[in-house]
Regions:
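Structured, contiguous alpha/beta core segments that scaffold functional sites
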Residues: 2-82, 103-265, 275-276, 416
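Compact mixed alphabeta submodule
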Residues: 181, 187-188, 291, 295, ...
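C-terminal helix-loop subdomains that flank or include functional centers
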Residues: 299-429
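A contiguous, surface-oriented mixed alpha/beta subdomain in the mid-to-C-terminal portion of proteins
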Residues: 223-357
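Detector for short helical micro-motifs
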Residues: 83-86, 95, 304
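Short, solvent-exposed polar/charged micro-motifs at secondary-structure junctions
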Residues: 153-158, 253-257, 281-284, 378-388
């Protein structure tokens, strides 16, 4: 940015951009090592209670429940990770506001983008922070702290630290607060320009009424109860029912002793009985219809897949008649493009508002065009067809196609200065 532009931004610097506090606000506490396990022995009544507590602002048990749900359910873990990796697996870039919006100060917008790009590239934990923010796709809330330090006489962003979910709470009026050593119970209000707050799918303005894990809780509970009954059934499946008949004159002590002998048959498969005892073994596991537990679990798995990925064919084809179909492998482990695009848009809006905005305005002033955060969404393309389209667009329609974009799209690196290049006649016949 030229001297004239820098002076203009400095003179136009408003008072809306408050200087954030240097250092880190959320520091480790002894209570951080404590952990709750609300998913253990979960019942419908307890689930309703936890969700209502979250609606009232006490979100710690709900967050612990969501974490346990992913840890204990392999299918839920798989679809949640697939959805998040569809976002975090894409490369990111900071683009000038002039490339997205019509701005008067093109030079200022480009300079702000270069500065923000340099700052983020120098933060080693920025990728980890983005992965932490992607957890909001399930919990619908994720927070990271911007750590500022004075360097060269100015306040500069030096780190972005994820904030543990146990440190978050919501007050009576619905405002997010963070628990600190000074305020371990009620928390403090989030200082301006100090935190990145990602709430991708808030319902009715309340972050706890949205989120995929809340929608997945009922499916998780139903599957959990079915699995519990299924394991009990598997333990008994194939083992004969042991029945012993005793004489009417048998004493209570003899009856108890006989019961112990029957129980020993379960594990030891051996026992000693009197000749007067009639022992009968009834073989189990040969009913006309199989137990419904597997069908129940498959139903809830399909519900989870639809909620997270937008369909069921993206994770499973067995049982759907597509084991040998050409359509089965083509959709395996994919997220619907409209869902991924929505995740990209929500993330970009949060990063621009809570991260790039403060970084740019604290450096160049309130009027600087804030750069944009983008994910490079790579759609499958036929390179031969794309080459033909580019040829027509440039030669016939005279469109101004950026050379850098063409190189990236075609997967052909740009030649360096002084590097030998192929001539235009290569491949000609």
């Amino acid at each position: 940015m030229g001297l004239r532009t820098l002076i203009a931004h400095a003179l136009g610097r408003g008072t809306n951009t408050e200087r954030p506090k240097a250092g880190q606000v959320v520091r480790p506490m002894a209570a951080d090592r404590w952990r709750d396990y609300p998913a253990d022995g979960l019942t419908p009544g307890r689930l309703v209670q936890i969700l209502r507590e979250a609606d009232d602002g006490a979100i710690d048990r709900a967050m612990a429940l969501y974490q346990q749900m992913e840890e204990k359910d392999a299918h839920l873990y798989a679809v949640a990770r697939t959805r998040r990796l569809a976002l975090t697996g894409l490369s990111w870039q900071v683009v000038s506001a002039a490339d997205v919006h019509d701005v008067a100060d093109r030079a200022g917008a480009d300079e702000a983008a270069d500065y923000c790009r340099k700052i983020l590239s120098g933060i080693e934990g920025f990728g980890d922070a983005l992965e932490h923010l992607s957890l909001a796709l399930g919990r619908n809330l994720a927070v990271a702290e911007n750590v500022w330090e004075f360097a060269g006489g100015e306040l500069r962003l030096v780190d972005i630290v994820p904030v543990a979910f146990e440190r978050l709470t919501i007050d009576e009026v619905g405002k997010l607060r963070v628990l600190t050593e000074e305020a371990p119970y009620d928390g403090i209000e989030l200082p301006p320009n100090k935190f990145v707050v990602h709430v991708p799918h808030a319902a009715s303005g309340h972050p706890m009424r949205g989120g995929l894990l809340r929608a997945s809780a009922i499916a998780y509970l139903g599957k959990h109860l079915a699995m519990k009954d299924w394991l009990v059934f598997v333990e008994l499946f194939g083992m004969p029912v042991r029945i012993a008949r005793y004489e009417p004159s048998a004493t209570p002590e003899e009856k108890r002793e006989l019961l112990k002998m029957l129980e020993s048959l379960r594990s030891d498969a051996a026992g000693v009985f009197s000749k007067a005892v009639e022992l009968q073994l009834m073989e189990a596991g040969h009913g006309k219809t199989p137990p419904p537990y597997e069908r129940i679990c498959e139903f809830f798995n399909r519900e989870l897949s639809k909620a997270w990925l937008g369909g069921t064919l993206t994770v499973e084809t067995t049982g759907a008649g597509l084991e040998r179909s050409s359509g089965g492998p083509g959709v395996h482990n994919e997220v619907r493009l409209d869902l991924r695009q929505d995740d990209i848009t929500c993330e970009a809006r949060t990063i621009r508002r809570d991260l790039l905005g403060p970084v740019a305005r604290l450096r160049f002033g309130e009027r600087v065009p804030v750069p944009c955060f983008r994910r490079q969404l790579e759609l499958p393309r036929d390179r031969r067809e794309l080459s033909e389209v580019l040829g027509r667009a440039v030669n016939e329609l005279h469109m101004r196609v950026p050379a850098r974009w063409a190189h990236e799209t075609l997967g052909i690196p740009a030649a360096g200065e002084g590097e030998q290049v192929l001539s235009e006649t290569v491949g000609a016949t």
